[in-house]
Amino acid sequence: MLCLMLCVLCWSRSDVAALGSVVENEDALLRHLFQGYQKWVRPVENSNDTIKVLFGLKISQLVDVDEKNQLMTTNVWLKQEWMDHKLSWNPEEYGGITAIRVPSESLWLPDIVLFENADGRFEGSLMTKAIVKYNGVVQWMPPASYKSSCTMELTFFPFDRQNCSMKFGSWTYDGSMVDLILVDENVDTKDFFDNGEWEILNAKGMKGNRKDGLYSYPFVTYSFVLRRLPLFYTLFLIIPCLGLSFLTVLVFYLPSDEGEKLSLSTSVLVSLTVFLLVIEEIIPSSSKVIPLIGEYLLFIMIFVTLSIIVTVFVINVHHRSSATYHPMAPWVKRLFLQKLPRLLCMKGHVDRYSFSDTEEKETTLKSKLPGKQKHKQAKDGEKVVIAFLEKAADSIRYISRHVKKDAFIRQVVQDWKFVAQVLDRIFLWLFLVVSVTGSVLIFTPALQMWLNSTL
């Protein structure tokens, strides 16, 4: 047991000694490297030498795409690597140390910034430690959160695709001092955290140069092709709008004497106004492009407004009669009582304006009454009976004319009601065709574009 304890004690002392030697070697190495090191001076042997910075981008999260303010917020890692000959050493002289971690604030940095920032934070990165290798290679991969400007193309919202770019380059050094070398044209997405509203279809970088007089300034531009996942807006915006448009069609299926026709149309118009305000909160205030969903809402609002006007007209027709000084014209009788009902598959309408049977009965009644010649030949007793019959006949004719007048008025009212039904049926089919056609024409290009992007 005593021997075991002695072995453990000797082993722990050797580890402590080894650890102490590593710490001492690293401390000595840091003092050696940074003795007289000036981080404000480019680490080159000759003043005309160019530092080549290997640059790459790794995206970890697409935080937000703000359509209203036209911003894209991302969390990325900036991969940077360059040669600093002042920070090289012989590993054998420092206990085999081949790499050390050094605070980036103590090193010369290539001051690479995002040009298209939108919040004033050009650097946007955390000053993490850098890895310095024995051969002078410096590797620095700081995390950064950027808000970059992105011009939104919302024509096909919510089936849209956006192309946002991020442009990186040195803020103060031209191409003769610091040159950017694109390591990989593809953005690293291995650790990308999926966004619930957007997916990245493509993310590639491209090197470019900006000329300014005699100087050239290299930069790297990364383009992100984003596609919106439209399920949310389809369920809570497009489908309700489609439902409201077809609900407008059903207004003409209600009976013409129902006062709820106008109430339904007005309620639909108010609902569409609310949806239009929701769209206005999402899209930017620009007159260059109007989203198709906005055009569709305007189309439906005009559609509903016309339905209200037509409904008022139909209700007016429904309550017309000869008593309101609206006699029915002959062409209205032929068109709305005879021809159109057959075309619209409605039950035939009885011609209520034929009075031949009544006139024949009245003529027959008059012919059966004794004339003046018969009166002269009649006896005095018969004259009394005939006079009584004539008075009775006059009363019957008066009652008959009154009854026919009332029946005529009722028939005219029924005819105007039938005309209102025919108008309702016409506008029902007309608005249904216009609603379906308009919906298809407006949404088909957006659906085609979105489906092509998925293939």
UniProtKB/Swiss-Prot annotation:
Cited PROSITE patterns: NEUROTR_ION_CHANNEL
Gene Ontology cellular-component terms listed: acetylcholine-gated channel complex; neuron projection; plasma membrane; postsynaptic membrane; synapse
Residue numbers on the Cytoplasmic membrane side: 318-425
The keyword Disulfide bond is annotated on this UniProt entry: yes
Membrane topology type: Multi-pass membrane protein
Catalyzed reactions: Ca(2+)(in) = Ca(2+)(out); K(+)(in) = K(+)(out); Na(+)(in) = Na(+)(out)
GO molecular-function terms, A-Z: acetylcholine-gated monoatomic cation-selective channel activity; transmembrane signaling receptor activity
Record keyword Membrane present: yes
Disulfides per UniProt: 150-164
Tissue: Relatively abundant in the developing retina and in the trigeminal ganglion.
Signal sequence coordinates: 1-20
Residues carrying covalently attached carbohydrate according to the record: 48, 163
InterPro entries, alphabetized: Neur_chan_lig-bd, Neur_chan_lig-bd_sf, Neur_channel, Neuro-gated_channel_TM_sf, Neuro_actylchol_rec, Neurotrans-gated_channel_TM, Neurotransmitter_ion_chnl_CS, Nicotinic_acetylcholine_rcpt
Pfam family name, one: Neur_chan_memb
Function: Component of neuronal acetylcholine receptors (nAChRs) that function as pentameric, ligand-gated cation channels with high calcium permeability among other activities. nAChRs are excitatory neurotrasnmitter receptors formed by a collection of nAChR subunits known to mediate synaptic transmission in the nervous system and the neuromuscular junction. Each nAchR subunit confers differential attributes to channel properties, including activation, deactivation and desensitization kinetics, pH sensitivity, cation permeability, and binding to allosteric modulators.
Quaternary structure annotation from Swiss-Prot or TrEMBL: Neuronal AChR seems to be composed of two different type of subunits: alpha and beta. CHRNB3/beta-3 subunit is only able to form functional nAChRs when co-assembled with another beta subunit. Participates in pentameric assemblies along with CHRNA4/alpha-4 and CHRNB2/beta-2 subunits and with CHRNA6/alpha-6 as well, forming stoichiometries such as (CHRNA3:CHRNB4)2:CHRNB3, (CHRNA4:CHRNB2)2:CHRNB3 or (CHRNA6:CHRNB2)2:CHRNB3.
Family statement: Belongs to the ligand-gated ion channel (TC 1.A.9) family. Acetylcholine receptor (TC 1.A.9.1) subfamily. Beta-3/CHRNB3 sub-subfamily.
Protein name in UniProt: Neuronal acetylcholine receptor subunit beta-3
Organism of derivation: Gallus gallus (Chicken)
